[in-house]
């Protein structure tokens, strides 16, 4: 049988792993938004490109906030290998449908984390 101290150590380790997975997800999201921004700029949708760059900055901020949380508690914040993001996104409507689906997925991840 595990002691309370051992159980606490297991829980803390699990939480730190989960937060680091979220950091990686936030960084992937940032890369996706940046790729979308570049794509929309190329397609001539400068306003949409600007908004997507704002989302890129927001995702970076989320990742940094999570990393700060881990570090301040003596943990090791890390970004695991990031999957390649797509570079072609279709019409502006398709871009924002992808944004919506992605935000729903990330929100689910956050809900599971907390």
Feature locations, PLM:
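Disorder-to-helix initiation segments
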Residues: 3-22
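Residue-level recognition of alpha-helical structural elements
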Residues: 15, 45-48, 92
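Mixed-charge, polar/low-complexity N-terminal
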Residues: 4-5, 9, 27, 38, ...
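Generic cytosolic/nucleocytoplasmic N-terminal low-complexity/intrinsically disordered segments
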Residues: 3-4, 75, 111
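Juxtamembrane/interface segments of multi-pass membrane proteins
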Residues: 11, 43, 85-88
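Acidic/histidine-rich alpha-helical segments that form the ligand environment
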Residues: 18-25, 29, 33-36, 68, ...
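Conserved alpha-helical segments that form or flank metal/cofactor-binding pockets of metalloenzymes
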Residues: 36-81
């Amino acid at each position: 049988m595990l002691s309370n101290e051992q159980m606490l150590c297991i829980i803390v380790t699990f939480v730190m792993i989960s937060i680091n997975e979220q950091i990686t997800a936030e960084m992937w999201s940032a890369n996706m938004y940046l790729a979308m921004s570049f794509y929309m700029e190329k397609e001539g949708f400068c306003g949409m490109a600007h908004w997507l760059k704002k989302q890129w900055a927001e995702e970076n901020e989320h990742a940094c906030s999570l990393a700060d949380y881990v570090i301040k508690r003596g943990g090791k914040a890390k970004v695991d290998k990031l999957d390649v993001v797509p570079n072609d996104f279709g019409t502006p409507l398709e871009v924002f449908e992808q944004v919506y689906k992605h935000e729903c997925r990330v929100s689910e991840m956050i809900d599971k984390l907390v």
